[in-house]
Structure formats: C-alpha cells, structure tokens
C-alpha cells in the first residue's frame, strides 16, 4: 500500500499543531494508520542589525530571529483519507507538502 508523507512547516507553532490535530482526526475517522507528527529540527534564522542608523557611537546590535518549525506525518494513502486531507483549511503562513511513496 502507498504511503503519503506530509511535511508541514511554518513560523507559528500553534497553527502547525492545529493542522496536525486535523490530520489526526481524519486518520481516526477513516481508520488509516498514522505515524507522527514527528518534530523535525527548528531552523533559526538570525539577522543582527546595528541600532544606530549613522554608525556613530558605540556598536550596539539588535538580534532579530525567525524560527521555522517543521513536522513530518506518515499516513496510509487511502483515497478517502487523501480527499479529506485536500479539503483542510490551511493557514496562509503554513507550508504543506504531500508526497506519495510506494
């Protein structure tokens, strides 16, 4: 049987967990096997910037960072379950990637 590998990524942790919960509910309703969600390493993007606009004075820095959270879910590729997965309302800032594997 084929498996569907679902990869979720985004900057808002709560929204990713909300989408994972919806996928779990679909798997329970349709009776397919589910593995995950497996948390993948969080990527931290750090941008240091100078506080003073002209370069004069002491060198003080602001450190801005953005964290990208990722989750991985494996689910059996049942036609009914995949149809329901396609109908999930995913927030704009959450990336979802579905790959079918044999």
From Swiss-Prot:
InterPro entries registered for this protein in UniProt: Ribosomal_uS10, Ribosomal_uS10_CS, Ribosomal_uS10_dom, Ribosomal_uS10_dom_sf, Ribosomal_uS10_euk/arc
Keywords carried by this UniProt record: Ribonucleoprotein, Ribosomal protein
GO biological process: translation
Cellular component terms (Gene Ontology): small ribosomal subunit
GO terms, molecular function: structural constituent of ribosome; tRNA binding
Alphabetized PROSITE patterns for the sequence: RIBOSOMAL_S10
Keyword Iron annotated: no
Keyword Ribonucleoprotein set for record: yes
Record family assignment: Belongs to the universal ribosomal protein uS10 family.
Physiological role: Involved in the binding of tRNA to the ribosomes.
Subunit relationships: Part of the 30S ribosomal subunit.
PANTHER family from the UniProt entry: 30S RIBOSOMAL PROTEIN S10 FAMILY MEMBER
Record protein name field: Small ribosomal subunit protein uS10
Organism field: Methanoculleus marisnigri (strain ATCC 35101 / DSM 1498 / JR1)
Name of the gene encoding the protein in the UniProt record: rps10
């Amino acid at each position: 049987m084929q498996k569907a590998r679902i990869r979720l990524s985004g900057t808002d942790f709560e929204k990713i967990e909300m989408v994972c919960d919806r996928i779990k509910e679909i798997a329970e309703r349709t009776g397919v096997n589910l593995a995950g969600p497996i948390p993948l390493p969080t990527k931290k993007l750090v941008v240091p910037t100078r506080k003073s606009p002209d370069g004069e004075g002491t060198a003080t820095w602001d450190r801005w960072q953005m964290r990208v959270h990722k989750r991985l879910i494996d689910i059996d590729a049942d036609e009914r379950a995949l149809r329901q997965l396609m109908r999930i309302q995913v927030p704009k800032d959450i990336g979802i990637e579905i790959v079918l594997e044999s």
